[in-house]
Amino acid sequence: MNIHEYQAKEILSAYGIPVPRGRVALTSDQVERAAKEMGGRCVIKAQIYAGGRGKAGGVKLVHHPEQAQDYGKELFGRRLITPQTGPEGLKVRRILVEEAVEIAREFYLSITLDRSTSRYCLIASAEGGVDIEEVVQKSPDKIHVLTIDPYTGLRPFQARRIALALGLSGTLCEDCVELMLNLYKVVLEKDCSLVEINPLVVTRAGWLMAMDAKINFDDNAIFRHREYPDMMDYSQLDTLEINAGKYDLSYIKLSGNIGCMVNGAGLAMATLDVLKEFGGEPANFLDVGGGATREKVAEAFKIILEDADVKGVFVNIFGGIMRCDVIAQGIIEAASEVHCTLPIVVRMDGSKVAEGKQLLVESGLNVQTADSLGEGAERIVGMLG
């Protein structure tokens, strides 16, 4: 689950991590008033669920309130397009107005999950303010990574080593140690999959400060934090993804024209790969899970068909826990209800597969069945030309 930068900074501030003074604005008039509070010279930052805002024109230094208001008018309602948004971009509905800070040095600091070790790892670099991926490619020696033992947690001596490796000393070194320990508390207590500060800066006055912040919460832990759903900005989410969430479906919109319904995340990823191998372009990632009911399958199929980009559907199901006849019933119910005329290819195997295929054949829908993943992928790609 994503949240906005201003929300991430509120959390960091509550844990004793210094952040710039700021106000959130919902109108250009509020931008002007906030700029006056900041003394006129301030930074205007569009709030969207994506990085790369600066290069897209979503971050600007202004020198007086009227200029801030004008820039607010320009930003509100505008779609920012960044490498993380896709070609459609994300609409700006909120703006963070922050005090301008004189910066002496910039660093990168984050704590994230390392899925290869199933542990949190702390990542730091003296190359802050840029995409960390660029630093990894161009200067991997400037990246410092520490895997954190879950039994002992992040220890002060480990944080001190990182701070020294960043070139900090004296009071700044000790301040950085305290900041990293507090950051680790945020990760644990808030059930985060990522907490990132980029850049973490040393100001001209000699203080550490988090100039930009990103926090992602672990979706599987949201039930432990009743306040999290209220923090979500649904205007930043795809409508189909919101609908999928209501039925506990894992759905991600992609840019192709082949709708996909699969059970199991691993099989879903493999399905996308094979479609690409045959020259197809998946329109979505959709995992219905291992124990989906007929109703859940029907809702999943409807969500796929709501996407105007979808020109054909590929269903790839392995019936272990799920029965193939239940899958077939859900597909038939949904396709009949919305009067689907799109070509559909279904590859099913496992429990009740013969019964499932028979139901599809007798349904009267534009459905073809396949006996393997490769055969099914090749067929739907061929049908769409």
Swiss-Prot record:
Cofactor dependence: Mg(2+)
Signal peptide segment:
none
Residues binding Mg(2+), per UniProt: N198, D212
Q: Which reaction does it catalyse?
A: succinate + ATP + CoA = succinyl-CoA + ADP + phosphate; GTP + succinate + CoA = succinyl-CoA + GDP + phosphate
Q: Pathway involvement?
A: Carbohydrate metabolism; tricarboxylic acid cycle; succinate from succinyl-CoA (ligase route): step 1/1
ATP-grasp domain spans which residues? 9-243
Q: Where does ATP bind?
A: K45, G52, R53, G54, E98, V101, E106
Does Ribonucleoprotein count among this protein's keywords?
Answer: no
The molecular function terms of the Gene Ontology recorded here are: ATP binding; magnesium ion binding; succinate-CoA ligase (ADP-forming) activity; succinate-CoA ligase (GDP-forming) activity
State which Enzyme Commission number(s) the record gives: 6.2.1.5
User: Mind telling me which InterPro entries this protein's record contains?
Assistant: ATP-grasp, ATP-grasp_succ-CoA_synth-type, ATP_grasp_subdomain_1, Succ-CoA_synthase_bsu_CS, SUCC_ACL_C, Succ_CoA_ligase-like_bsu, Succinyl-CoA_synth-like
Query: What highest taxon heads this organism's lineage?
Result: Bacteria
Cellular component GO terms held in the UniProt record: cytosol; succinate-CoA ligase complex
Write out the residues that bind substrate.
N263, G320, I321, M322
Cofactor details (free text): Binds 1 Mg(2+) ion per subunit.
Keywords, sorted A to Z: ATP-binding, Ligase, Magnesium, Metal-binding, Nucleotide-binding, Tricarboxylic acid cycle
Query: Which family, according to the similarity comment?
Result: Belongs to the succinate/malate CoA ligase beta subunit family.
Quaternary structure note: Heterotetramer of two alpha and two beta subunits.
Q: What does this protein do?
A: Succinyl-CoA synthetase functions in the citric acid cycle (TCA), coupling the hydrolysis of succinyl-CoA to the synthesis of either ATP or GTP and thus represents the only step of substrate-level phosphorylation in the TCA. The beta subunit provides nucleotide specificity of the enzyme and binds the substrate succinate, while the binding sites for coenzyme A and phosphate are found in the alpha subunit.
Q: What is the official name of this protein in its record?
A: Succinate--CoA ligase [ADP-forming] subunit beta
Q: Whose protein is this, by species?
A: Geobacter sulfurreducens (strain ATCC 51573 / DSM 12127 / PCA)
Lineage here is: Bacteria, Pseudomonadati, Thermodesulfobacteriota, Desulfuromonadia, Geobacterales
Name of the gene encoding the protein in the UniProt record = sucC
